[in-house]
Design a protein with these regions (language model features):
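Conserved short beta-strand edge segments in small beta-sheet-based binding/regulatory domains
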Residues: 28-34, 55-76
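Short amphipathic alpha-helix segments
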Residues: 9-30, 52-53
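Short, surface-exposed ligand-recognition loops at beta-strand->loop->(often short) alpha-helix junctions
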Residues: 4-14, 81-86
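Short, low-order "capping/linker" segments at domain edges
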Residues: 48, 72-94
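Surface-exposed aromatic
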Residues: 36-40
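Generic non-transmembrane alpha-helical segments
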Residues: 17-25, 56, 60, 96, ...
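Short beta-strand-to-loop capping motifs
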Residues: 6-10, 41-49
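Conserved mixed alpha/beta catalytic, RNA-binding, or beta-rich assembly cores of soluble enzyme
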Residues: 86-191
Length: 191
């Protein structure tokens, strides 16, 4: 029996039927969120029983979706809370991984902006290392990313995915030693 991660979203009315079914089939609920009249269950269920759970949840107006990141904690690291660093791309990335089942936390650095003063303090480093993976969201400027990244990765023991404005090829060229993943063309762009 192979367990796969799924998310159930539906009304709170009679959601216990779905919870009991999941447990009876040999699966388990990782997290349960009750939001007003809606419930969200992140769970692991047997692969061969997903269609049965979908059939049972249909009359309850529930939907079952694949969620490959259930049980994963991801730190989305932003350079500051300022308007040019945090709100748009950081929130988009955090919401995207949340929809795939991950638990995302925003970490904004006290000394992130500026090439000269950029750095992590011990508390920030410890918080980032508590996660399964860290997504660093840096800016649009190659020189800034190249200069800051060695300082910002010092002491980080979890895999790092680097997001920035330059293309993937440019990010791979300017980061040494390499990080675990790159996502280019992410940031604030003129429209």
């Amino acid at each position: 029996m192979t367990l796969v991660p799924v998310t159930y979203k539906g009304g709170i009315f009679q959601h216990d039927i779905v919870v009991d079914l999941i447990e009876d089939l040999g699966g388990y609920v990782v997290q349960k969120h009750v939001l007003a009249q809606e419930v969200v269950l992140q769970c692991f269920v047997p692969r061969e029983d997903i269609e049965l759970i979908r059939e049972i949840s249909r009359p309850l107006f529930g939907e079952v979706t694949d969620s490959p990141l259930v049980g994963t904690e991801i730190a989305v690291v932003s350079m500051s809370l300022e308007i040019h660093h945090l709100p748009h791309p950081s929130c988009d990335i955090a919401e995207y991984v949340r929809r795939l089942g991950a638990k995302s936390n925003m970490v904004s650095l006290a000394r992130g902006p500026g090439k000269r003063i950029a750095g992590l303090n011990d508390e920030e480093r410890d918080v980032i290392n508590e996660h399964d993976i860290a997504v660093y969201l840096l800016g649009n400027f190659e020189t800034c990313i190249e200069y800051k990244m060695p300082t910002l990765r010092r002491g980080i023991e979890v895999p790092i995915v680097l997001c920035g404005g330059p293309d993937i090829e440019v990010l791979k060229k300017i980061i040494d030693p390499p990080v675990d993943g790159y996502v280019g063309n992410v940031g604030r762009f003129m429209r």
